[in-house]
From Swiss-Prot:
Record's subunit section: Monomer. Part of the FGAM synthase complex composed of 1 PurL, 1 PurQ and 2 PurS subunits.
Binding residue positions for substrate: 99-102, 121, 245, 317-319, 540
Identification of the protein by name: Phosphoribosylformylglycinamidine synthase subunit PurL
GO CC annotation terms, alphabetical: cytoplasm
Binding site for Mg(2+) 2: 122, 273
GO biological process: 'de novo' IMP biosynthetic process
UniProt xrefs under InterPro entries: PRibForGlyAmidine_synth_PurL (IPR010074), PurL_linker (IPR041609), PurM-like_C_dom (IPR010918), PurM-like_C_sf (IPR036676), PurM-like_N (IPR016188), PurM-like_N_sf (IPR036921)
Positions that bind Mg(2+) 1: 98, 538
Pfam families on file: AIRS, AIRS_C, FGAR-AT_linker
E.C. code: 6.3.5.3
Species for this entry: Bacillus pumilus (strain SAFR-032)
Length: 743
């Protein structure tokens, strides 16, 4: 839209055009009062994206303030591109998770691909080299053609971008549930490594210093992407394909290498990715954080389309772009580095001392706004919150153990449920070995990468069981953090910190805001108990389709430190004769379980209980046993319960089986989802030492070499007798089989 066609100040107000950009009447009146005049079209657009939920967290700030964000090893908490945690030896790990839900529902390949690209830029803009990508994906039931299409395209988009840029995708999770039918979730996490002296911040310091634009040219793609991500899906959403950006991983690879070289040059003052809200957010946020202002001449912005207006340039979310602040007079040093990588680097403005964002276009001042008003002074809403009617009903509903006539058949069916089934079809499309640092590939409890030149390694995971959160968001929030930590510990690592992605429905509905509040309470309590501070994250609200919300899905990304690569542990049984232990007692808890969903087609009842002090004690005892060389394998018990965890531990073991005798109330208890449990194997000579070290561990059987999975009760009655290769075939074949089948 050219300047000549843009609505006047008066039209914007009288025709309430600001509402189309996502601003309310009250917000527009507040803008008028802050700047002392009516904003023009460009300024209205700038305020609308900066004050969107996606950029300002205006609905979620009161909830986010509950999270513990400080810790002994935290070098950078929330507020920058990514969080940073010290791991010793002058090194730190940098990580962050972000959502690209709305774009992925409309244009799944590009939506997922650019989600990966954006989170990688967040990490390298801190000065870190990205070493791994993970993801957390949610889709509807894998029986409808639409869901199959979204699933295949999202995975292809993640693979296409990650593989081209040369960063391994080492882990993640994929869940399928009716609640995501119209609104899939695509959360991407990136982990990077950095030396302390290389840490950079997104700040525009030093009056007179040069503001430099680097990377791809600006086009019209992604305009109002941040606003689009702050509203519910409707039939009109399909028309917003232009709000989905297009990614170029080869450009990103060049940008990554060039930026990491530039970061070593002391001419660089500040650097930030142009992510949500593009040029607008990067310039306003960098200036606001530094207590300065920025003036830019938009005629100098590299453009790939003709006749772009100031509004379009400032709101574009074209990918692979960075904004830098360079020491005045040293611009050529930086330009030379980017030219070496065949990248455009252009001086487009300078830092000022008046705390204003001033934009010139075609000889006119087209924007003059206070940066703090944009970046810090969005209204904060304390939304009404009310407990949904179903919650009390669930608390008071007794869930009986499902009647099971054939436990072997039930186990096989559970292994074929898409949420439990092997995700090999997914991760086989990812290059998870590129750069050759991957020690534990996708498919175990966590991805593990060694840190070259040291004995250390990093374990990483994403976790969330949204069914528990639907039943009880506070308990479910605790479980999400605890399960992530369990996965880290099972890999031989000490949990360090959390990055969270809060995916919820429309916060303007009191029962949805209640879910957000309660889950944050649960997450906060678990993070405090387990000493895993929240160092950053993302909020994605308005995940609704035709008025129906997704299950509350606060995904927990967690990273842990393996002190010695000799401690790295996987879920797979290692050798015949090893003794199998289960840590933790099993209760009859079926609400929200995979078994309940499979047998009854719905979930209801009281969520499984969790005692965080017990959880911590078991995790610490298991980690100490691993570090003391007592453990052969370790696997957390999650979806599908003990039966599934034990069976999974036999898969991929080249002929091993298991002979289990266990004291449980019923066959159904094999599939109960009681929390804080682990399946562990130890060598026979370590049996007594392990039992003494881990108080809640009970011996339940032996690893065999006959390739048979056998489970008996205490009386010796056989519940399951099945060939491991048959179970594994069912588990591995489930997703490919569903994708091929006609709905």
């Amino acid at each position: 839209m050219s300047l000549l066609l843009e609505p006047s100040h008066k039209q914007i107000k009288e025709e309430k055009l600001y509402q189309q950009m996502g601003l309310s009447d009250e917000e527009f009146a507040l803008i008028e009062s802050i700047i002392g005049r009516l904003p023009n079209y460009t300024e209205t657009g700038i305020f609308s994206v900066m004050w969107s939920e996606h950029c300002s967290y205006k609905n979620s700030k009161p909830v986010l303030s509950k999270f513990p964000t400080k810790g002994e090893h935290v070098l950078q908490g929330p507020g920058e591109g990514a969080g940073i945690v010290d791991i010793g030896d002058n090194q730190a790990v940098v990580f962050k998770i972000e959502s690209h839900n709305h774009p992925s529902a409309i244009e799944p390949y590009q939506g997922a691909a650019t989600g990966v690209g954006g989170i990688i830029r967040d990490v390298f803009s801190m000065g870190a080299r990205p070493i791994a990508v993970l993801n957390s994906l949610r889709f509807g039931e894998l029986t409808s053609p639409r869901v199959k299409y979204l699933f295949e395209e999202v995975v292809a988009g993640i693979a296409g971008y990650g593989n081209c840029i040369g960063i391994p995708t080492v882990g993640g999770e994929v869940h399928f549930d009716q609640s995501y039918e119209g609104n899939p979730l695509v959360n991407a996490m990136c982990v990077g490594l950095i030396n302390h002296e290389d840490i950079k911040k997104g700040q525009a310091k030093g009056v007179g210093n040069t503001v430099m634009y680097v990377g791809a040219k600006t086009g019209r793609d992604g305009i109002h992407g941040a606003t689009f991500a702050s509203e519910e899906f409707s039939d009109e959403s399909e028309e917003k394909r232009s709000a989905v950006q297009v990614g170029d991983p080869f450009m990103e690879k060049l940008l990554l290498e060039a930026c990491l070289e530039v970061i070593k040059n002391d001419a660089l003052v500040g650097i930030q990715d142009m992510g949500a809200a593009g040029l607008t957010s990067s310039s306003a946020e960098m200036a606001s954080k530094a207590g300065s202002g920025i003036e830019m001449n938009l005629d100098l912005i590299p453009q790939r389309e003709t006749g772009m207006s100031a509004y379009e340039m400032m709101l574009s979310e074209s990918q692979e772009r960075m904004l830098l602040v360079i020491e005045k007079g040293r611009e050529q040093e930086i330009i030379d580095i980017f030219e070496k990588y065949d990248l455009e680097a252009v001086s487009v403005g300078h830092v000022t001392d008046d705390k204003m964002l001033r934009l010139l276009h075609q000889g006119e001042v087209v924007c003059e706004l206070p940066v703090d008003a944009l970046a810090e002074e969005a209204p904060v809403y304390h939304k009404p919150s009310s407990e949904p009617a179903y919650y009390r009903e669930f608390l008071e509903t007794k869930v009986e153990a499902p009647a099971i006539t054939d436990a072997a058949q039930t186990l096989k069916q559970l292994l074929q449920q898409p949420t439990i089934a092997s995700k090999e079809w997914v991760y086989d499309q990812y290059d998870y070995m590129v750069r050759t640092n991957t020690v534990v590939a996708p498919g175990s409890d966590a991805g593990v990468l060694r840190i070259r030149g040291t004995k250390k390694a990093l374990a990483m995971t994403t976790d969330c069981n949204a069914r528990y959160l639907y039943l009880d968001p506070e308990v479910g929030g605790k479980i999400a953090v605890a399960e992530a930590a369990r996965n880290i510990v099972c890999s031989g690592a000490r949990p360090l910190a959390v990055t969270d992605n809060l995916n919820f429905g429309n916060p303007e509905k009191p029962e949805i805001f209640w879910q957000i509040e309660k889950s944050a309470d649960g997450i906060s309590e678990a993070c405090r108990t387990l000493s895993t501070p929240v160092i950053g994250g993302n909020v994605s609200l308005y995940n609704e389709s035709n008025g129906t919300a997704i299950y509350p899905t606060p995904v927990i990304g967690m990273v842990g430190l393996v002190e010695d690569t000799a401690h790295i542990t996987t879920k797979s049984f290692q050798q015949a004769g090893d003794v199998i232990f289960v840590i933790g007692e099993t209760k009859e808890e079926f609400a929200g379980s995979e078994l309940q969903k499979m047998t009854e087609g719905r979930i209801y009842g009281k969520a499984p209980e969790i005692d965080l002090d017990v959880e911590l004690a078991r995790q610490e005892a298991l980690l100490a046993a691993i570090q003391n060389g007592l453990v052969q394998s370790a696997h957390d018990v999650s979806e599908g319960g003990l039966g599934v965890a034990l069976a999974e531990s036999t898969f991929g073991t080249d002929g091993l089986g298991a002979d289990i005798q266990i004291d449980l109330d019923s066959e159904a208890s094999l599939f109960s989802e009681t929390q804080s449990r682990f399946v562990v194997t130890v060598k026979p000579e370590h049996r007594e030492a392990f039992a003494a070290a881990v108080k809640d561990a009970k011996e339940v059987g032996t690893v065999t070499n006959d390739g048979v999975f056998t489970v008996k009760n205490q009386e010796g009655q056989q519940w399951i007798h099945a060939a491991v290769n048959e179970l594994e075939r069912a588990w591995k074949g489930a997703i490919p089989c569903l994708l091929k089948s006609e709905a």
